[in-house]
Amino acid sequence: MDPQQQFCLKWNSFSSNLAITFSNLFKSDLLADVILSCDGVVFKAHKLILAACSKKFADLFENTPTNGQCVIILEATTPDNMAALLEFMYKGEVHVSQEALNSFLKSAESLQVKGLSTETGRLAAQQAQQHMGDLSPLDSPTGRRSVRNSLSGGSSSIVPGGVGIGLGGGATGANSMSGMGIGNGLSLAGMAAGGGMAAAANAAASSLSTLAASANIVDRCGSAGANIISGSAAGIGGSHSGGAGNGSGTVGIGGNGVGSGGGNNGPISLGSGAGAAHHLGGSTGILKQECDSLMHPGGSSSSSGMGYTHVPPIYRPINYEPPRKRAIVRSPYSEQEQRGSVLRDGSKSSECPSPINKPPYHRPSSSASSTAPTEADTMHSERASPQSSRYENHSPSTTAGNGNATSSLERIVKSERNNGSANEANDDDRELMDESTDNGAEDLRVKLENLKYSPPPPPNSNTSSTTPNTLLENLKADGTLSSNLAASIAPADMLNVWNATKMNNKNSVNTADGKKLKCLYCDRLYGYETNLRAHIRQRHQGIRVPCPFCERTFTRNNTVRRHIAREHKQEIGLAAGATIAPAHLAAAAAASAAATAAASNHSP
Protein backbone atom coordinates (compact mmCIF):
# COMPACT_ATOMS: atom_id res chain seq x y z
CA MET A 1 0.00 0.00 0.00
CA ASP A 2 1.34 3.41 -0.97
CA PRO A 3 2.06 5.49 2.18
CA GLN A 4 1.36 8.66 0.19
CA GLN A 5 -2.17 7.54 -0.63
CA GLN A 6 -4.89 9.60 1.00
CA PHE A 7 -8.60 9.07 1.44
CA CYS A 8 -11.15 11.82 0.99
CA LEU A 9 -13.82 11.74 3.69
CA LYS A 10 -16.77 13.96 2.86
CA TRP A 11 -19.91 14.68 4.82
CA ASN A 12 -22.81 15.31 2.48
CA SER A 13 -24.92 16.91 5.23
CA PHE A 14 -22.25 19.43 6.24
CA SER A 15 -24.04 22.52 4.90
CA SER A 16 -27.45 21.50 6.20
CA ASN A 17 -25.98 20.71 9.61
CA LEU A 18 -24.40 24.16 9.83
CA ALA A 19 -27.69 25.79 8.84
CA ILE A 20 -29.57 23.85 11.52
CA THR A 21 -26.91 24.71 14.11
CA PHE A 22 -27.08 28.43 13.28
CA SER A 23 -30.87 28.32 13.55
CA ASN A 24 -30.65 26.66 16.97
CA LEU A 25 -28.10 29.25 18.13
CA PHE A 26 -30.46 32.02 17.03
CA LYS A 27 -33.27 30.59 19.14
CA SER A 28 -31.06 30.27 22.23
CA ASP A 29 -28.39 32.55 23.70
CA LEU A 30 -25.91 29.71 24.14
CA LEU A 31 -22.24 30.62 23.54
CA ALA A 32 -23.11 34.27 22.82
CA ASP A 33 -20.04 36.54 23.00
CA VAL A 34 -21.30 39.93 21.77
CA ILE A 35 -24.16 42.21 22.81
CA LEU A 36 -25.92 44.55 20.36
CA SER A 37 -27.86 47.51 21.78
CA CYS A 38 -30.50 49.34 19.72
CA ASP A 39 -32.57 52.04 21.49
CA GLY A 40 -32.32 50.23 24.80
CA VAL A 41 -33.13 46.78 23.37
CA VAL A 42 -30.34 44.23 23.86
CA PHE A 43 -29.57 41.40 21.44
CA LYS A 44 -27.09 38.61 22.17
CA ALA A 45 -25.22 37.26 19.17
CA HIS A 46 -22.04 35.49 18.10
CA LYS A 47 -19.03 37.25 16.63
CA LEU A 48 -18.26 34.48 14.20
CA ILE A 49 -21.68 34.59 12.54
CA LEU A 50 -21.83 38.39 12.49
CA ALA A 51 -18.38 38.63 10.93
CA ALA A 52 -19.22 35.99 8.34
CA CYS A 53 -22.41 37.78 7.27
CA SER A 54 -21.43 41.46 7.58
CA LYS A 55 -18.30 43.16 6.31
CA LYS A 56 -18.73 46.03 8.75
CA PHE A 57 -18.91 43.70 11.75
CA ALA A 58 -15.87 41.81 10.47
CA ASP A 59 -13.80 45.02 10.26
CA LEU A 60 -15.07 46.07 13.69
CA PHE A 61 -14.12 42.80 15.39
CA GLU A 62 -10.66 42.83 13.84
CA ASN A 63 -9.87 46.20 15.48
CA THR A 64 -11.31 45.41 18.93
CA PRO A 65 -9.67 43.32 21.66
CA THR A 66 -10.88 39.75 22.01
CA ASN A 67 -10.79 39.48 25.81
CA GLY A 68 -14.26 39.26 27.31
CA GLN A 69 -17.60 40.26 25.84
CA CYS A 70 -18.01 43.43 23.86
CA VAL A 71 -21.04 45.68 23.62
CA ILE A 72 -21.90 47.40 20.33
CA ILE A 73 -24.35 50.31 20.33
CA LEU A 74 -26.18 50.83 17.05
CA GLU A 75 -27.80 54.25 16.92
CA ALA A 76 -29.02 54.31 13.32
CA THR A 77 -30.81 50.95 13.47
CA THR A 78 -34.20 50.30 15.04
CA PRO A 79 -34.81 47.20 17.20
CA ASP A 80 -37.24 45.75 14.66
CA ASN A 81 -34.77 46.07 11.81
CA MET A 82 -31.97 44.62 13.93
CA ALA A 83 -34.06 41.62 14.91
CA ALA A 84 -34.91 41.03 11.25
CA LEU A 85 -31.26 41.39 10.23
CA LEU A 86 -30.15 38.88 12.87
CA GLU A 87 -32.76 36.39 11.67
CA PHE A 88 -31.55 36.86 8.10
CA MET A 89 -27.91 36.34 9.07
CA TYR A 90 -28.64 33.22 11.15
CA LYS A 91 -31.29 31.58 8.92
CA GLY A 92 -30.66 33.03 5.48
CA GLU A 93 -34.22 34.34 5.05
CA VAL A 94 -36.61 36.75 6.76
CA HIS A 95 -40.16 38.02 6.23
CA VAL A 96 -40.51 41.82 6.15
CA SER A 97 -43.67 43.83 5.57
CA GLN A 98 -43.89 46.25 2.66
CA GLU A 99 -44.02 49.30 4.93
CA ALA A 100 -40.77 48.37 6.71
CA LEU A 101 -38.92 47.18 3.62
CA ASN A 102 -37.22 50.48 2.77
CA SER A 103 -35.88 51.11 6.27
CA PHE A 104 -34.81 47.47 6.54
CA LEU A 105 -32.79 47.69 3.33
CA LYS A 106 -31.18 50.94 4.47
CA SER A 107 -30.11 49.32 7.73
CA ALA A 108 -28.71 46.34 5.83
CA GLU A 109 -26.86 48.74 3.53
CA SER A 110 -25.31 50.63 6.46
CA LEU A 111 -24.17 47.38 8.12
CA GLN A 112 -23.03 45.92 4.77
CA VAL A 113 -24.94 42.68 5.27
CA LYS A 114 -24.09 40.17 2.58
CA GLY A 115 -27.02 39.32 0.37
CA LEU A 116 -28.95 42.52 1.17
CA SER A 117 -26.56 45.35 0.33
CA THR A 118 -25.53 46.49 -3.14
CA GLU A 119 -21.88 45.81 -2.44
CA THR A 120 -22.19 42.45 -4.14
CA GLY A 121 -23.72 44.12 -7.19
CA ARG A 122 -20.92 46.67 -7.33
CA LEU A 123 -18.24 43.99 -7.17
CA ALA A 124 -19.94 42.03 -9.95
CA ALA A 125 -20.18 45.17 -12.09
CA GLN A 126 -16.49 45.96 -11.57
CA GLN A 127 -15.51 42.45 -12.57
CA ALA A 128 -17.66 42.71 -15.68
CA GLN A 129 -16.05 46.04 -16.60
CA GLN A 130 -12.56 44.61 -16.14
CA HIS A 131 -13.47 41.63 -18.30
CA MET A 132 -14.81 43.91 -21.04
CA GLY A 133 -11.71 46.07 -20.85
CA ASP A 134 -9.41 43.07 -21.25
CA LEU A 135 -11.19 41.90 -24.40
CA SER A 136 -10.37 43.41 -27.76
CA PRO A 137 -13.20 44.68 -29.96
CA LEU A 138 -12.95 41.57 -32.15
CA ASP A 139 -12.98 39.02 -29.30
CA SER A 140 -16.68 39.31 -28.54
CA PRO A 141 -19.72 39.10 -30.85
CA THR A 142 -20.69 42.62 -29.79
CA GLY A 143 -17.33 43.98 -30.86
CA ARG A 144 -17.45 42.20 -34.19
CA ARG A 145 -20.98 43.49 -34.80
CA SER A 146 -19.88 47.03 -33.91
CA VAL A 147 -16.96 46.92 -36.31
CA ARG A 148 -19.16 45.50 -39.07
CA ASN A 149 -21.78 48.21 -38.58
CA SER A 150 -19.18 50.96 -38.31
CA LEU A 151 -17.82 50.10 -41.73
CA SER A 152 -21.15 51.12 -43.28
CA GLY A 153 -21.64 54.53 -41.68
CA GLY A 154 -19.53 55.37 -38.68
CA SER A 155 -16.93 54.34 -36.11
CA SER A 156 -16.93 53.53 -32.41
CA SER A 157 -14.33 53.36 -29.70
CA ILE A 158 -14.05 52.27 -26.06
CA VAL A 159 -12.97 54.98 -23.64
CA PRO A 160 -12.48 53.91 -20.00
CA GLY A 161 -13.09 56.25 -17.14
CA GLY A 162 -16.26 57.93 -18.34
CA VAL A 163 -18.98 59.17 -16.01
CA GLY A 164 -22.39 57.73 -16.76
CA ILE A 165 -25.31 59.96 -15.82
CA GLY A 166 -28.89 59.03 -16.75
CA LEU A 167 -29.19 61.14 -19.89
CA GLY A 168 -31.22 60.31 -22.96
CA GLY A 169 -32.24 62.03 -26.14
CA GLY A 170 -34.63 61.52 -29.03
CA ALA A 171 -34.25 62.12 -32.72
CA THR A 172 -36.53 65.15 -32.80
CA GLY A 173 -35.51 66.72 -29.57
CA ALA A 174 -38.95 66.30 -28.01
CA ASN A 175 -38.47 62.93 -26.35
CA SER A 176 -36.51 62.72 -23.12
CA MET A 177 -35.79 59.90 -20.67
CA SER A 178 -34.14 60.11 -17.27
CA GLY A 179 -31.87 57.40 -15.87
CA MET A 180 -31.13 56.53 -12.26
CA GLY A 181 -27.70 56.82 -10.77
CA ILE A 182 -24.32 58.28 -11.42
CA GLY A 183 -20.94 56.67 -11.12
CA ASN A 184 -17.65 56.01 -12.74
CA GLY A 185 -17.74 53.27 -15.28
CA LEU A 186 -17.11 52.51 -18.91
CA SER A 187 -17.89 54.95 -21.71
CA LEU A 188 -18.38 54.00 -25.31
CA ALA A 189 -17.97 57.00 -27.58
CA GLY A 190 -18.19 56.89 -31.32
CA MET A 191 -18.88 58.92 -34.35
CA ALA A 192 -22.27 57.38 -35.17
CA ALA A 193 -24.23 58.05 -38.29
CA GLY A 194 -26.87 55.53 -39.28
CA GLY A 195 -25.26 52.12 -38.73
CA GLY A 196 -22.78 53.46 -36.19
CA MET A 197 -25.59 54.34 -33.82
CA ALA A 198 -27.06 50.86 -34.24
CA ALA A 199 -23.70 49.38 -33.27
CA ALA A 200 -23.60 51.55 -30.17
CA ALA A 201 -27.14 50.50 -29.30
CA ASN A 202 -26.21 46.83 -29.70
CA ALA A 203 -23.23 47.28 -27.42
CA ALA A 204 -25.46 49.05 -24.92
CA ALA A 205 -27.98 46.21 -25.04
CA SER A 206 -25.27 43.62 -24.39
CA SER A 207 -23.93 45.59 -21.44
CA LEU A 208 -27.47 46.09 -20.16
CA SER A 209 -28.15 42.34 -20.07
CA THR A 210 -24.91 41.70 -18.14
CA LEU A 211 -25.56 44.44 -15.60
CA ALA A 212 -29.22 43.56 -15.20
CA ALA A 213 -28.31 39.98 -14.31
CA SER A 214 -25.82 41.14 -11.66
CA ALA A 215 -28.23 43.65 -10.16
CA ASN A 216 -31.16 41.18 -9.89
CA ILE A 217 -33.58 43.18 -12.03
CA VAL A 218 -36.94 41.52 -11.69
CA ASP A 219 -39.56 44.05 -12.72
CA ARG A 220 -40.14 44.60 -16.42
CA CYS A 221 -42.72 46.75 -18.12
CA GLY A 222 -43.16 47.83 -21.72
CA SER A 223 -44.91 50.63 -23.61
CA ALA A 224 -45.45 51.62 -27.25
CA GLY A 225 -42.19 52.89 -28.64
CA ALA A 226 -40.19 52.18 -25.48
CA ASN A 227 -39.27 49.32 -23.15
CA ILE A 228 -38.61 50.25 -19.52
CA ILE A 229 -36.70 47.98 -17.16
CA SER A 230 -37.12 49.27 -13.63
CA GLY A 231 -35.63 48.33 -10.27
CA SER A 232 -35.12 49.81 -6.81
CA ALA A 233 -31.94 51.75 -6.26
CA ALA A 234 -30.91 55.24 -5.23
CA GLY A 235 -29.26 57.55 -7.70
CA ILE A 236 -29.20 60.84 -9.51
CA GLY A 237 -31.18 61.28 -12.72
CA GLY A 238 -31.18 63.79 -15.46
CA SER A 239 -32.73 64.55 -18.82
CA HIS A 240 -31.36 65.61 -22.12
CA SER A 241 -32.84 66.34 -25.50
CA GLY A 242 -30.89 66.08 -28.68
CA GLY A 243 -31.42 67.71 -32.00
CA ALA A 244 -32.05 66.05 -35.31
CA GLY A 245 -29.25 65.27 -37.68
CA ASN A 246 -26.10 63.23 -37.77
CA GLY A 247 -23.65 63.60 -34.99
CA SER A 248 -21.78 61.79 -32.27
CA GLY A 249 -23.33 59.47 -29.68
CA THR A 250 -22.00 58.51 -26.26
CA VAL A 251 -22.69 55.29 -24.39
CA GLY A 252 -21.80 55.41 -20.69
CA ILE A 253 -21.98 52.75 -18.00
CA GLY A 254 -22.41 54.52 -14.71
CA GLY A 255 -23.88 54.25 -11.22
CA ASN A 256 -26.97 52.51 -9.91
CA GLY A 257 -29.27 53.05 -12.88
CA VAL A 258 -29.54 52.62 -16.58
CA GLY A 259 -31.00 55.21 -18.92
CA SER A 260 -30.66 55.18 -22.66
CA GLY A 261 -32.11 57.22 -25.48
CA GLY A 262 -31.50 56.64 -29.13
CA GLY A 263 -31.92 58.46 -32.39
CA ASN A 264 -29.48 59.64 -34.95
CA ASN A 265 -28.04 61.95 -32.36
CA GLY A 266 -27.96 61.78 -28.59
CA PRO A 267 -26.08 60.16 -25.72
CA ILE A 268 -27.01 56.74 -24.31
CA SER A 269 -26.01 56.06 -20.71
CA LEU A 270 -26.09 52.73 -18.90
CA GLY A 271 -25.88 52.36 -15.12
CA SER A 272 -24.50 49.40 -13.20
CA GLY A 273 -27.13 49.21 -10.45
CA ALA A 274 -30.59 47.75 -10.08
CA GLY A 275 -32.65 50.37 -11.93
CA ALA A 276 -32.79 50.85 -15.67
CA ALA A 277 -34.72 52.73 -18.33
CA HIS A 278 -33.94 52.86 -21.99
CA HIS A 279 -35.84 54.41 -24.89
CA LEU A 280 -35.38 52.84 -28.28
CA GLY A 281 -36.08 54.76 -31.47
CA GLY A 282 -34.65 55.79 -34.80
CA SER A 283 -31.89 53.48 -35.97
CA THR A 284 -32.33 51.14 -32.96
CA GLY A 285 -35.55 49.70 -34.42
CA ILE A 286 -34.19 46.14 -34.65
CA LEU A 287 -33.45 45.95 -30.93
CA LYS A 288 -36.85 47.48 -30.20
CA GLN A 289 -38.58 44.87 -32.36
CA GLU A 290 -36.87 42.08 -30.47
CA CYS A 291 -37.92 43.57 -27.14
CA ASP A 292 -41.49 44.06 -28.38
CA SER A 293 -41.59 40.47 -29.59
CA LEU A 294 -40.51 39.38 -26.11
CA MET A 295 -43.26 41.38 -24.40
CA HIS A 296 -45.93 40.57 -27.05
CA PRO A 297 -45.04 37.27 -28.76
CA GLY A 298 -48.22 37.14 -30.83
CA GLY A 299 -48.23 40.74 -32.02
CA SER A 300 -46.09 42.95 -34.22
CA SER A 301 -43.96 46.03 -33.75
CA SER A 302 -45.98 49.14 -33.01
CA SER A 303 -43.66 51.78 -34.40
CA SER A 304 -42.00 50.23 -37.41
CA GLY A 305 -45.04 48.39 -38.74
CA MET A 306 -43.05 45.23 -39.47
CA GLY A 307 -44.42 41.85 -38.26
CA TYR A 308 -41.90 40.05 -36.03
CA THR A 309 -43.21 36.73 -34.76
CA HIS A 310 -39.87 34.96 -34.34
CA VAL A 311 -38.53 35.08 -30.75
CA PRO A 312 -34.73 35.54 -30.75
CA PRO A 313 -32.74 32.84 -28.91
CA ILE A 314 -31.34 35.37 -26.45
CA TYR A 315 -34.83 36.23 -25.18
CA ARG A 316 -36.24 32.71 -25.15
CA PRO A 317 -37.01 31.20 -21.73
CA ILE A 318 -35.52 27.89 -20.66
CA ASN A 319 -38.69 25.88 -21.32
CA TYR A 320 -39.52 27.60 -24.65
CA GLU A 321 -40.96 25.35 -27.33
CA PRO A 322 -41.94 26.46 -30.85
CA PRO A 323 -45.63 26.17 -31.70
CA ARG A 324 -46.56 22.93 -33.37
CA LYS A 325 -49.61 21.67 -35.17
CA ARG A 326 -52.07 19.65 -33.19
CA ALA A 327 -52.13 16.03 -34.31
CA ILE A 328 -55.44 14.25 -34.62
CA VAL A 329 -55.32 11.01 -32.64
CA ARG A 330 -58.07 8.49 -33.16
CA SER A 331 -59.36 6.82 -30.02
CA PRO A 332 -58.85 3.03 -29.85
CA TYR A 333 -62.33 2.71 -28.35
CA SER A 334 -63.96 3.86 -31.58
CA GLU A 335 -62.06 1.29 -33.65
CA GLN A 336 -62.88 -1.48 -31.20
CA GLU A 337 -66.52 -0.42 -31.17
CA GLN A 338 -66.70 -0.40 -34.96
CA ARG A 339 -65.13 -3.85 -35.23
CA GLY A 340 -67.54 -5.21 -32.62
CA SER A 341 -70.58 -3.72 -34.37
CA VAL A 342 -69.57 -5.22 -37.72
CA LEU A 343 -69.22 -8.64 -36.09
CA ARG A 344 -72.68 -8.35 -34.56
CA ASP A 345 -74.90 -7.20 -37.39
CA GLY A 346 -72.67 -6.04 -40.27
CA SER A 347 -73.45 -2.34 -39.73
CA LYS A 348 -71.92 0.49 -37.76
CA SER A 349 -73.14 1.01 -34.26
CA SER A 350 -75.22 4.06 -33.43
CA GLU A 351 -76.25 2.97 -29.98
CA CYS A 352 -73.05 3.83 -28.13
CA PRO A 353 -70.85 6.58 -29.61
CA SER A 354 -68.30 6.67 -26.80
CA PRO A 355 -66.86 4.34 -24.14
CA ILE A 356 -68.36 6.61 -21.47
CA ASN A 357 -71.95 5.78 -22.34
CA LYS A 358 -71.25 2.06 -22.63
CA PRO A 359 -68.41 0.19 -20.90
CA PRO A 360 -66.16 -2.09 -22.93
CA TYR A 361 -67.42 -5.13 -21.07
CA HIS A 362 -71.04 -4.50 -22.14
CA ARG A 363 -72.75 -7.47 -23.74
CA PRO A 364 -76.10 -6.69 -25.41
CA SER A 365 -78.95 -8.91 -24.34
CA SER A 366 -80.93 -10.39 -27.20
CA SER A 367 -83.07 -12.83 -25.22
CA ALA A 368 -86.20 -10.74 -25.68
CA SER A 369 -85.86 -10.58 -29.45
CA SER A 370 -84.19 -13.85 -30.47
CA THR A 371 -83.88 -17.29 -28.96
CA ALA A 372 -80.71 -18.26 -30.86
CA PRO A 373 -77.36 -16.61 -30.05
CA THR A 374 -75.50 -14.76 -32.76
CA GLU A 375 -71.93 -15.42 -33.79
CA ALA A 376 -70.68 -12.32 -32.01
CA ASP A 377 -72.28 -13.47 -28.74
CA THR A 378 -70.60 -16.86 -29.03
CA MET A 379 -67.21 -15.29 -29.69
CA HIS A 380 -67.69 -12.88 -26.79
CA SER A 381 -68.58 -15.71 -24.39
CA GLU A 382 -65.54 -17.71 -25.45
CA ARG A 383 -63.25 -14.72 -24.88
CA ALA A 384 -64.85 -13.92 -21.53
CA SER A 385 -64.60 -17.49 -20.21
CA PRO A 386 -61.56 -19.29 -21.65
CA GLN A 387 -61.62 -21.87 -18.89
CA SER A 388 -65.21 -22.83 -19.61
CA SER A 389 -64.49 -23.19 -23.32
CA ARG A 390 -61.66 -25.58 -22.51
CA TYR A 391 -64.20 -28.10 -21.19
CA GLU A 392 -67.11 -27.22 -23.43
CA ASN A 393 -65.33 -27.42 -26.80
CA HIS A 394 -64.80 -31.19 -26.38
CA SER A 395 -68.28 -31.92 -25.10
CA PRO A 396 -70.62 -33.79 -27.49
CA SER A 397 -73.62 -31.96 -26.08
CA THR A 398 -72.29 -28.60 -27.27
CA THR A 399 -70.81 -29.72 -30.58
CA ALA A 400 -73.77 -31.77 -31.76
CA GLY A 401 -76.58 -30.52 -33.94
CA ASN A 402 -78.67 -29.41 -30.99
CA GLY A 403 -76.05 -27.04 -29.64
CA ASN A 404 -78.14 -24.02 -30.59
CA ALA A 405 -81.01 -25.27 -28.47
CA THR A 406 -78.72 -25.66 -25.49
CA SER A 407 -77.44 -22.12 -25.89
CA SER A 408 -80.98 -20.81 -26.24
CA LEU A 409 -82.03 -22.48 -22.99
CA GLU A 410 -79.01 -21.03 -21.24
CA ARG A 411 -79.95 -17.57 -22.43
CA ILE A 412 -83.58 -18.12 -21.37
CA VAL A 413 -82.58 -19.05 -17.81
CA LYS A 414 -80.09 -16.20 -17.59
CA SER A 415 -82.63 -13.69 -18.87
CA GLU A 416 -85.18 -15.06 -16.40
CA ARG A 417 -82.75 -14.36 -13.58
CA ASN A 418 -82.38 -10.85 -14.90
CA ASN A 419 -86.20 -10.53 -14.63
CA GLY A 420 -86.58 -10.56 -18.41
CA SER A 421 -85.85 -6.87 -18.61
CA ALA A 422 -84.36 -5.56 -21.84
CA ASN A 423 -83.22 -2.30 -20.23
CA GLU A 424 -81.54 -3.91 -17.22
CA ALA A 425 -78.25 -2.21 -18.16
CA ASN A 426 -79.75 1.23 -17.59
CA ASP A 427 -81.30 0.28 -14.25
CA ASP A 428 -78.42 -1.52 -12.61
CA ASP A 429 -74.86 -1.23 -13.98
CA ARG A 430 -73.53 -3.60 -11.38
CA GLU A 431 -75.66 -6.39 -12.86
CA LEU A 432 -73.72 -6.04 -16.12
CA MET A 433 -70.37 -6.04 -14.35
CA ASP A 434 -71.28 -9.19 -12.46
CA GLU A 435 -72.47 -10.83 -15.67
CA SER A 436 -69.11 -10.20 -17.34
CA THR A 437 -66.96 -11.27 -14.39
CA ASP A 438 -69.02 -14.17 -13.06
CA ASN A 439 -67.94 -16.86 -15.53
CA GLY A 440 -70.26 -19.81 -15.36
CA ALA A 441 -73.13 -18.29 -13.36
CA GLU A 442 -75.63 -20.32 -15.39
CA ASP A 443 -76.72 -23.70 -14.16
CA LEU A 444 -74.56 -26.60 -15.29
CA ARG A 445 -77.55 -28.86 -15.28
CA VAL A 446 -78.99 -26.99 -18.25
CA LYS A 447 -75.93 -27.98 -20.29
CA LEU A 448 -76.27 -31.67 -19.31
CA GLU A 449 -79.70 -32.04 -20.86
CA ASN A 450 -81.02 -34.85 -22.98
CA LEU A 451 -79.16 -35.24 -26.27
CA LYS A 452 -82.40 -35.95 -28.17
CA TYR A 453 -83.90 -32.55 -27.35
CA SER A 454 -85.16 -30.57 -30.34
CA PRO A 455 -85.86 -26.82 -30.24
CA PRO A 456 -89.51 -25.72 -30.13
CA PRO A 457 -91.11 -24.15 -33.20
CA PRO A 458 -90.90 -20.36 -33.47
CA PRO A 459 -93.69 -18.57 -31.64
CA ASN A 460 -96.58 -16.78 -33.31
CA SER A 461 -96.93 -13.06 -33.79
CA ASN A 462 -98.09 -12.67 -30.21
CA THR A 463 -95.39 -10.66 -28.48
CA SER A 464 -96.34 -11.83 -25.01
CA SER A 465 -95.18 -15.40 -25.75
CA THR A 466 -91.60 -14.32 -26.54
CA THR A 467 -90.71 -13.46 -22.96
CA PRO A 468 -88.43 -15.92 -21.11
CA ASN A 469 -91.13 -16.76 -18.53
CA THR A 470 -93.66 -17.64 -21.23
CA LEU A 471 -91.19 -19.71 -23.24
CA LEU A 472 -90.11 -21.65 -20.18
CA GLU A 473 -93.70 -22.34 -19.16
CA ASN A 474 -94.55 -23.47 -22.69
CA LEU A 475 -91.61 -25.87 -22.72
CA LYS A 476 -92.70 -27.36 -19.40
CA ALA A 477 -96.34 -27.64 -20.51
CA ASP A 478 -95.51 -29.32 -23.82
CA GLY A 479 -93.38 -31.94 -22.08
CA THR A 480 -90.43 -31.12 -24.30
CA LEU A 481 -88.08 -30.85 -21.35
CA SER A 482 -87.07 -34.00 -19.54
CA SER A 483 -88.43 -34.54 -16.05
CA ASN A 484 -85.08 -34.20 -14.33
CA LEU A 485 -84.24 -31.02 -16.27
CA ALA A 486 -87.62 -29.43 -15.57
CA ALA A 487 -87.30 -30.26 -11.87
CA SER A 488 -83.83 -28.78 -11.68
CA ILE A 489 -84.96 -25.35 -12.91
CA ALA A 490 -85.92 -23.14 -9.99
CA PRO A 491 -89.36 -21.51 -9.91
CA ALA A 492 -89.82 -18.03 -11.33
CA ASP A 493 -90.44 -16.46 -7.93
CA MET A 494 -87.14 -17.82 -6.65
CA LEU A 495 -85.29 -16.73 -9.78
CA ASN A 496 -86.68 -13.20 -9.44
CA VAL A 497 -85.83 -12.85 -5.75
CA TRP A 498 -82.74 -10.80 -6.44
CA ASN A 499 -84.32 -8.48 -9.01
CA ALA A 500 -87.48 -8.09 -6.94
CA THR A 501 -85.39 -6.71 -4.10
CA LYS A 502 -82.67 -4.71 -5.77
CA MET A 503 -79.91 -3.39 -3.61
CA ASN A 504 -80.26 0.21 -2.52
CA ASN A 505 -78.68 2.44 0.06
CA LYS A 506 -80.69 0.80 2.82
CA ASN A 507 -78.93 -2.53 2.25
CA SER A 508 -75.47 -1.06 2.92
CA VAL A 509 -74.11 -0.95 6.47
CA ASN A 510 -71.22 1.21 7.66
CA THR A 511 -68.73 -0.78 9.72
CA ALA A 512 -65.24 -0.20 11.06
CA ASP A 513 -63.78 -1.82 7.93
CA GLY A 514 -65.87 0.34 5.60
CA LYS A 515 -69.24 0.04 3.89
CA LYS A 516 -70.60 -3.51 3.74
CA LEU A 517 -73.53 -5.04 1.86
CA LYS A 518 -76.14 -6.77 4.02
CA CYS A 519 -78.09 -9.80 2.90
CA LEU A 520 -81.82 -9.22 2.49
CA TYR A 521 -82.75 -12.44 4.27
CA CYS A 522 -80.13 -12.78 7.00
CA ASP A 523 -77.58 -10.63 8.81
CA ARG A 524 -74.54 -11.69 6.80
CA LEU A 525 -72.32 -8.83 5.59
CA TYR A 526 -70.23 -8.91 2.41
CA GLY A 527 -67.74 -6.47 0.99
CA TYR A 528 -68.45 -7.26 -2.66
CA GLU A 529 -71.72 -7.61 -4.50
CA THR A 530 -70.61 -10.77 -6.34
CA ASN A 531 -70.09 -12.56 -3.03
CA LEU A 532 -73.53 -11.45 -1.84
CA ARG A 533 -75.12 -12.73 -5.05
CA ALA A 534 -73.40 -16.10 -4.65
CA HIS A 535 -74.60 -16.27 -1.04
CA ILE A 536 -78.22 -15.60 -2.05
CA ARG A 537 -78.11 -18.17 -4.85
CA GLN A 538 -76.61 -20.80 -2.58
CA ARG A 539 -78.39 -20.25 0.75
CA HIS A 540 -81.73 -18.68 -0.11
CA GLN A 541 -82.49 -19.78 -3.70
CA GLY A 542 -81.06 -23.29 -3.47
CA ILE A 543 -79.26 -23.06 -6.79
CA ARG A 544 -76.25 -25.36 -6.62
CA VAL A 545 -74.20 -27.19 -9.23
CA PRO A 546 -73.53 -30.90 -8.46
CA CYS A 547 -70.39 -32.80 -9.32
CA PRO A 548 -71.11 -35.66 -11.79
CA PHE A 549 -68.64 -37.97 -10.04
CA CYS A 550 -69.35 -37.43 -6.33
CA GLU A 551 -71.93 -36.10 -3.87
CA ARG A 552 -70.53 -32.60 -3.59
CA THR A 553 -72.36 -29.54 -4.88
CA PHE A 554 -70.97 -26.14 -5.71
CA THR A 555 -72.18 -22.61 -6.32
CA ARG A 556 -70.28 -21.82 -9.53
CA ASN A 557 -69.47 -23.80 -12.67
CA ASN A 558 -65.82 -22.83 -12.55
CA THR A 559 -65.54 -24.39 -9.12
CA VAL A 560 -67.02 -27.64 -10.44
CA ARG A 561 -64.58 -27.74 -13.35
CA ARG A 562 -61.59 -27.16 -11.10
CA HIS A 563 -62.88 -29.84 -8.73
CA ILE A 564 -63.25 -32.39 -11.57
CA ALA A 565 -59.81 -31.61 -12.96
CA ARG A 566 -58.22 -31.94 -9.53
CA GLU A 567 -60.14 -34.77 -7.80
CA HIS A 568 -61.49 -36.97 -10.60
CA LYS A 569 -58.56 -37.50 -12.92
CA GLN A 570 -58.74 -41.26 -12.46
CA GLU A 571 -62.44 -41.44 -13.28
CA ILE A 572 -61.82 -39.55 -16.50
CA GLY A 573 -59.00 -41.95 -17.40
CA LEU A 574 -61.08 -45.07 -16.64
CA ALA A 575 -63.97 -43.78 -18.68
CA ALA A 576 -61.66 -43.21 -21.61
CA GLY A 577 -60.67 -46.92 -21.63
CA ALA A 578 -57.54 -48.90 -20.97
CA THR A 579 -56.11 -48.27 -24.44
CA ILE A 580 -54.53 -44.99 -25.34
CA ALA A 581 -57.17 -42.90 -27.05
CA PRO A 582 -57.00 -39.45 -28.62
CA ALA A 583 -57.61 -36.45 -26.42
CA HIS A 584 -60.96 -35.52 -27.96
CA LEU A 585 -62.27 -39.07 -27.46
CA ALA A 586 -61.23 -39.03 -23.81
CA ALA A 587 -62.93 -35.68 -23.30
CA ALA A 588 -66.11 -36.96 -24.97
CA ALA A 589 -66.14 -40.02 -22.72
CA ALA A 590 -65.67 -37.84 -19.64
CA ALA A 591 -68.55 -35.59 -20.68
CA SER A 592 -70.80 -38.60 -21.25
CA ALA A 593 -69.96 -39.95 -17.82
CA ALA A 594 -70.72 -36.57 -16.30
CA ALA A 595 -74.10 -36.42 -18.06
CA THR A 596 -75.00 -39.91 -16.83
CA ALA A 597 -74.04 -39.10 -13.27
CA ALA A 598 -76.03 -35.87 -13.35
CA ALA A 599 -79.09 -37.68 -14.67
CA SER A 600 -78.85 -40.29 -11.92
CA ASN A 601 -78.50 -37.63 -9.24
CA HIS A 602 -81.60 -35.77 -10.44
CA SER A 603 -83.79 -38.87 -10.79
CA PRO A 604 -86.47 -39.17 -8.02
Curated annotation (Swiss-Prot):
It is found in: Nucleus. GO terms for molecular function: zinc ion binding. Residues 425-437 have a biased composition (Acidic residues). Residues 384-409 have a biased composition (Polar residues). SMART domains: BTB (SM00225), ZnF_C2H2 (SM00355). Residues 122-155, 291-310, 330-437, 450-470 are annotated as: Disordered. Disruption phenotype: Inappropriate morphogenesis of larval mushroom body neurons with early-born neurons adopting the fate of late-born neurons from the same lineage. Malformed eyes and head capsules due to defects in eye progenitor cells. RNAi-mediated knockdown in adult cyst stem cells and early cyst cells results in the appearance of cells resembling ovarian follicle cells throughout the testis. RNAi-mediated knockdown in adult cyst stem cells results in loss of expression of the male-specific isoform of transcription factor dsx and leads to male sterility. Broadly expressed in the developing larval central nervous system (at protein level). Expressed in the larval lymph gland and circulating hemocytes (at protein level). Expressed in all cell types of the adult testis stem cell niche but not detected in somatic cells of the adult ovary (at protein level). In the testis, expressed at high levels in cyst stem cells and early cyst cells and, at lower levels, in germline stem cells (at protein level). Required for morphological differentiation of postmitotic neurons during postembryonic brain development. Ensures production of appropriate neuron subtypes within a lineage by preventing precocious generation of late neuronal types of that lineage. Acts as a downstream mediator of the transcriptional activator Stat92e and is required for the development of the eye-antennal disk which gives rise to the adult eye, antenna and head capsule, for transcriptional repression of the Notch receptor ligand Ser and for the self-renewal of cyst stem cells in the testis. This is Zinc finger protein chinmo. It comes from Drosophila melanogaster (Fruit fly). The gene is chinmo.
